[in-house]
């Protein structure tokens, strides 16, 4: 059963589990569980997608309860009226506040993007980050005898595919557990020493104007058990 974070007569938001596809996809034709279908069965009515989260990413995922509301909300996303914030655990010490303004060329997936144009120019991509916590762990990762990590807040300003993951790789602080853009040695160290295998990227907050009431709505999502375990092992509290 999905954790419902917000629900009214027009919208419903859930805390998407890591590893779960938002909807049926040829990315994995053998998968049988999807957020959309599970939520539909759970609340007893159809839901309409507004935005998406990558399969390995957890956190706030918003759906509309009608196609009309979905269209109104999609306009807010397109016009950048929606504010999103993420938490990520990254390699190394990343402190302070900075903006990453680095255009990204779409990395086409052989399956998901099989019909997409291959020669697209790099697209504008902007991410703000803020370092929140740091830690050094007494086990080796690659050529280093210790492993350093940072907890960071990430705020995307453009909706590019894998933008946060690609931007963190660009600044040499890849997200822990990222099998596509991450550090293989760091991922192995996390798994062997801490038993952590997921992508440590979590959509913790989503703010928007309600399409009917015009109220400012902010929805937050708590961390799952594996995140909580990692935070405890790193001694990161009161985040």
From Swiss-Prot:
For this UniProt entry, the molecular function terms from Gene Ontology, in alphabetical order, are: pseudouridine synthase activity; RNA binding; tRNA pseudouridine(65) synthase activity
Q: Where are the transmembrane segments?
A: none
Output one GO BP term.
enzyme-directed rRNA pseudouridine synthesis
* Disulphide-bridged cysteine pairs: none
Q: Could you list this entry's UniProt keywords, alphabetically sorted.
A: Isomerase, tRNA processing
Per the record, the coiled-coil ranges are none
Under PROSITE patterns, the record lists: PSI_RLU
Q: What is its EC number?
A: 5.4.99.26
Q: Cite a single Pfam family from the UniProt record.
A: PseudoU_synth_2
Q: Where is the active site?
A: 54
The question of whether Nuclease is a record keyword is answered with no
EC class: isomerase
Entry-linked InterPro entries: PsdUridine_synth_cat_dom_sf, PsdUridine_synth_RluA-like_CS, PsdUridine_synth_RsuA/RluA, RluA_PseudoU_synthase
Listed under catalytic activity are: uridine(65) in tRNA = pseudouridine(65) in tRNA
Q: Superkingdom, according to UniProt?
A: Bacteria
Q: Which family does it belong to?
A: Belongs to the pseudouridine synthase RluA family.
Which NCBIfam families does UniProt cross-reference here? PRK11112.1
Record's function text: Responsible for synthesis of pseudouridine from uracil-65 in transfer RNAs.
What name does UniProt use for this protein?
Answer: tRNA pseudouridine synthase C
């Amino acid at each position: 059963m999905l954790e419902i974070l917000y629900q009214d007569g027009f919208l419903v938001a859930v805390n998407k589990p890591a590893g779960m596809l938002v909807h049926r996809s040829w990315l994995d034709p053998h998968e049988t569980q999807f957020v959309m279908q599970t939520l539909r069965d759970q609340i007893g009515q159809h839901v309409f997608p507004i935005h998406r989260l990558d399969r390995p990413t957890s956190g706030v995922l918003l759906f509309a309860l009608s196609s009309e509301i979905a269209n109104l909300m999609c306009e807010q996303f397109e016009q950048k009226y929606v504010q999103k914030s993420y938490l990520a655990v990254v390699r190394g010490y990343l402190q302070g506040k900075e903006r990453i303004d680095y255009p990204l060329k779409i990395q086409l997936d052989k399956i998901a993007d099989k019909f997409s144009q291959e020669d697209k120019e790099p697209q504008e991509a902007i991410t703000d980050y803020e370092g929140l916590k740091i830690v050094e762990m007494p086990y080796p990762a690659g050529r280093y005898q210790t492993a350093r990590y940072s907890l960071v807040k990430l705020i995307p300003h453009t909706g590019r595919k894998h933008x946060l993951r690609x931007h963190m790789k660009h600044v040499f602080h890849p997200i822990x557990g990222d099998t596509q853009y991450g550090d293989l040695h760091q991922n192995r160290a996390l798994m062997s020493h801490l038993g952590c295998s997921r992508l440590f990227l979590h959509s913790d907050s989503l703010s928007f104007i309600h399409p009917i009431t015009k109220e400012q709505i902010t929805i937050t999502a708590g961390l799952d058990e594996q995140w909580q375990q990692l935070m405890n092992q790193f001694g990161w509290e009161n985040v």
